[in-house]
């Protein structure tokens, strides 16, 4: 357990995670109050990484539940090992036959077999999934419930007992209560609103893209091999790309990847040509690439003209109405694109909120 907020910052920094005062305070309170932590924000700002680093910093085992649409409780809580149950019935056929051998009628035989039902629906045949495993674990764990907003609302209801009391009820067996409360971290990309009942049970943290100074500090801490001067320029370029109307804004991890890419190529000067040749490291959709190519010259030099060569070498030309963006249908939107569309966040473009004073309580910047 951490002794202070500063202790949290130092422990996370020791694992390569740069945390500001607000983030460190929230994590400190989570560990002291034994409350789940819900982290919301755009993709790629370090929500999942925080859970991993917390596990490493506290020397706890990490259990992860990756949420997805259509997920049911058998994949999250527990399920019965039917194969094992069937195997036992085959092995115990003779014993079962003895139990019903002197039964005078079918009803009596069924009653006798039913009396043994608890044997087959016992802890012996219970297959734990991440949520139940976190409760039953004898060692301290960090439970990461990743992208809870991707799951159906029914799964949220299943989580309430765990989040509120650190226990899981199995009707056939009973209630399992954690002997050592897990550190529970839930993440959400805000593709939908979460239930108020779930939020009430959690501490809340909003993670946004960090300020330029902090993002530069993060890039430096990763030993990318890029000089400070080039790293500073690169961070400014990435922040400029995030201001564009892109389907997916560049994440912090992609900024780091871009820095490493430029270092591997031995780049000693940033220019629009170099950046355009490597922009696919941070821009992953064809239409976004074209927008980025148009913007890169002015992001490097506001007075620069756009060289025609920047538009060449990024795939063959398309006829009218044709695009590499196969995820889009005739209406120009796919299910995933709809979930990640610009404007999902109340303050503006997805991952690029309106500029507000740093003291605003609703938009703390941290990584």
Q: What are the residue ranges of the model-derived segments?
A:
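C-terminal regulatory/interaction module of P-loop NTP-utilizing enzymes
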Residues: 1-367
């Amino acid at each position: 357990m951490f002794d202070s907020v500063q202790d949290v910052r130092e422990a996370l920094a020791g694992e390569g995670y740069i945390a500001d005062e607000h983030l460190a305070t929230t994590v400190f309170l989570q560990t002291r109050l034994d409350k789940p932590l819900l982290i919301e924000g755009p993709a790629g700002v370090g929500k999942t990484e925080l859970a991993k680093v917390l596990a490493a910093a506290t020397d706890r085992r990490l259990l992860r539940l990756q949420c997805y649409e259509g997920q049911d409780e058998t994949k999250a809580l527990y399920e019965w090992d039917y194969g094992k149950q069937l195997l036992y019935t085959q092995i115990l056929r003779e014993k079962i036959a003895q139990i019903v051998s002197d039964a005078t009628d079918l009803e009596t035989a069924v009653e006798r077999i039913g009396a043994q039902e608890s044997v087959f629906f016992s802890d012996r045949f219970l297959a734990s999934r991440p949520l139940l495993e976190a409760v039953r674990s004898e060692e301290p764990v960090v439970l990461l419930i990743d992208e809870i907003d991707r799951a159906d609302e029914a799964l949220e209801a299943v989580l309430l007992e765990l989040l509120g009391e650190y226990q899981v009820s199995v009707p056939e067996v009973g209630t399992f209560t954690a002997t050592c409360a897990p550190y529970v971290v839930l993440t959400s990309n805000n593709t939908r609103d979460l239930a108020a009942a779930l939020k009430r049970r959690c501490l809340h943290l909003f993670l946004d893209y960090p300020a330029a100074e902090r993002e530069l500090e993060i890039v430096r801490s990763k030993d990318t091999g890029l000089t400070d001067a080039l790293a500073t320029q690169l961070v400014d370029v990435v922040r400029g790309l995030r201001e564009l109307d892109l389907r997916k804004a560049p994440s912090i991890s992609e900024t780091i990847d871009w820095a490493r890419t430029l270092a591997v190529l031995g780049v000693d000067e940033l220019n629009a040509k170099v950046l355009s040749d490597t922009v696919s490291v941070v821009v992953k959709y064809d239409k976004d690439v074209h927008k980025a190519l148009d913007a890169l010259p002015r992001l490097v030099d506001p007075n620069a003209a756009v060289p025609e060569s920047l538009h060449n070498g990024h795939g063959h030309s398309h006829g009218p109405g044709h695009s590499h963006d196969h995820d889009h249908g005739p209406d120009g939107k796919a299910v995933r694109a709809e979930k990640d569309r610009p404007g999902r966040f109340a303050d503006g473009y997805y991952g690029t909120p309106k500029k507000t004073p740093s003291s605003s309580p609703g938009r703390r910047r941290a990584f």
